[in-house]
């Protein structure tokens, strides 16, 4: 079966975008760090030169401080350079993996099956990382050599920040907001505002009203024009720090806000890093199961309906397998306009040379494959045995099946 490589690229797009986004963010960190440190060092040197009356000890102390700062900058830059090298390596590996499709012309070829197996392992590892199974995902990546195709570090940091929010700690999420402030602002995100509001609310809960006022003056001025109603609602807590349930302010004081902050962080994290909100493994399973799902897959095995009896013999259908049958219950049925009738004995299509026949119990097989199977199993003359139930029926009781 021929295929077009570009049809497969859509599943690789999120990983490629994430690699480029990591490179962009890392470059911004390098640029911002260099600009800040250069400004500080130049300002210190200018001040040192202009202070002609300063003692030698004071000058030596400032020079030592500068040397220490330069050493710290060097270590920081080395760390950022190592991160950049890692992101470049990951990007190159993902592009090479995607480029392997160019030499494949058949979806049934061994090359495409090997490529698909690697992709499946990557999708499973991504799913496990997104759901907190970091240890299992790391082992899978190591065994399958997927370290450069799966963003283990990204998901680990996400889990760390998400868990810290649920533990009512805001330091990690504020640090993340600071690193990505530009893109959060571009996306009109309110994550940092909500995190700052939560810190303000916690100060009020602790009866630290003076500290809460100082905190509001220091951090809320930026959002005063954009979110005045939200800030006014929070400011009312200074005058009325306790409210009964059902009041307009009770939601601000509720512990449910921590769940809300964790959910808000998740949506912002996926938007910043171009991570699909629904795992690709979910999307692929849903599409595949829905394309194969028919009413026959969900007939009761104890039903006397002949279709229910026949459905138990279709072992090639993925939707009929116990592990996938439950997953497909909520999915729509396939919109099939042209059916292919398959022999349950051989898995091959039925045609005029191997026309379908039905036993009295309702089970249907191809006549030629049924005769061949019975000859191989020594059925007595004039009878045919049902391969599924093992019962024998006279040949004349078989009925020809017509598909309309």
UniProtKB/Swiss-Prot annotation:
One of its GO terms (biological process) is negative regulation of gluconeogenesis. Pathway: Protein modification; protein ubiquitination. GO terms for cellular component: cytoplasm; cytosol; GID complex; nucleus. Residues 116-148 form the LisH domain. Its main location: cytoplasm. This is GID complex subunit 9. It is found in: Cytoplasm; Nucleus. It is an enzyme of class 2 (transferase). Coiled coil: none annotated. Component of the GID E3 ligase complex recruiting N termini and catalyzing ubiquitination of proteins targeted for degradation. GID E3 is regulated through assembly with interchangeable N-degron-binding substrate receptors induced by distinct environmental perturbations. Required for the adaptation to the presence of glucose in the growth medium; mediates in association with the substrate receptor VID24/GID4 the degradation of enzymes involved in gluconeogenesis when cells are shifted to glucose-containing medium. Belongs to the FYV10 family. It catalyses: S-ubiquitinyl-[E2 ubiquitin-conjugating enzyme]-L-cysteine + [acceptor protein]-L-lysine = [E2 ubiquitin-conjugating enzyme]-L-cysteine + N(6)-ubiquitinyl-[acceptor protein]-L-lysine. A zinc finger (RING-Gid-type) spans 317-389. CDD domains: RING-Ubox_Emp (cd16659). Keywords: Cytoplasm, Metal-binding, Nucleus, Transferase, Ubl conjugation pathway, Zinc, Zinc-finger. Disulfide bonds: none annotated. Pfam families: CTLH, LisH. GO terms for molecular function: ubiquitin protein ligase activity; zinc ion binding. Its EC number is 2.3.2.27. Identified in the GID/CTLH complex. In the absence of stress, the complex exists as an inactive anticipatory complex (GID(Ant)), composed of Gid1, the E3 ubiquitin-ligase Gid2, Gid5, Gid8, and the RING-like subunit Gid9, awaiting a substrate receptor to form the active E3 ligase complex. When cells are shifted to glucose-containing medium, the substrate receptor Gid4 is induced and becomes part of the complex, named GID(SR4). Additionally, Gid7 transforms the GID(SR4) E3 ligase core into a higher-order supramolecular assembly (Chelator-GID(SR4)). PANTHER family: E3 UBIQUITIN-PROTEIN TRANSFERASE MAEA, MACROPHAGE ERYTHROBLAST ATTACHER-RELATED. It comes from the Eukaryota. Residues 154-211 form the CTLH domain.
């Amino acid at each position: 079966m021929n295929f077009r490589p570009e049809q497969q690229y859509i599943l690789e797009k999120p990983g490629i975008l994430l690699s480029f986004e990591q490179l962009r963010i890392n470059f911004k960190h390098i640029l911002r760090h260099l600009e800040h440190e250069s400004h500080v060092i130049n300002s210190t040197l200018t001040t040192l030169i202009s202070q002609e009356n300063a003692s030698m000890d004071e000058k030596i102390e400032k020079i030592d401080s500068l040397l220490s700062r330069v050493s710290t900058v060097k270590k920081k830059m080395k760390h950022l350079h190592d991160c950049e090298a890692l992101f470049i390596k990951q990007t190159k590996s993902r592009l090479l993996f995607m480029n392997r499709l160019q030499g494949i012309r058949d979806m049934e070829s061994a090359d495409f099956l090997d490529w698909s197996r690697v992709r499946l392992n990557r999708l499973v590892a991504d799913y496990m990382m997104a759901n907190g199974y970091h240890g299992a995902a790391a082992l899978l990546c190591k065994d399958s050599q997927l370290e450069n195709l799966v963003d283990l570090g990204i998901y680990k940091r996400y889990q760390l920040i998400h868990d810290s929010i649920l533990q009512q700690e805001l330091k990690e999420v504020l640090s993340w907001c600071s690193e990505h402030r530009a893109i959060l602002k571009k996306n009109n995100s309110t994550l940092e505002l909500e995190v700052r509001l939560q810190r303000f609310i916690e100060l009020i809960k602790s009866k630290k009203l003076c500290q809460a006022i100082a905190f509001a003056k220091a951090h809320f001025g930026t959002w005063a024009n954009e979110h005045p109603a939200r800030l006014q609602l929070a400011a009312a807590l200074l005058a009325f720090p306790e409210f009964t349930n059902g009041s307009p302010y009770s939601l601000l004081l509720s512990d449910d806000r921590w769940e809300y902050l964790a959910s808000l962080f998740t949506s912002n994290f996926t938007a910043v890093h171009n991570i699909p909100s629904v795992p690709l493994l979910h999307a692929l399973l849903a599409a595949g199961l829905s394309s194969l799902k028919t009413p026959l897959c969900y007939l009761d095995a104890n039903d006397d309906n002949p279709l229910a009896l026949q459905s138990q013999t279709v072992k090639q259908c993925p939707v009929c397998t116990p592990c996938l049958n439950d997953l497909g219950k909520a999915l729509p049925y396939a919109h099939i306009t042209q059916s292919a009738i398959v022999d349950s004995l051989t898995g091959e299509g039925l045609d005029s040379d191997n026309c379908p026949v039905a036993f009295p119990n309702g089970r249907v097989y191809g006549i030629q494959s049924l005769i061949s199977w019975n000859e191989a199993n020594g059925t007595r003359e004039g009878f045919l045995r049902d391969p599924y139930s093992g019962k024998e029926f006279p040949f004349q009781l078989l009925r020809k099946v017509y598909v309309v």
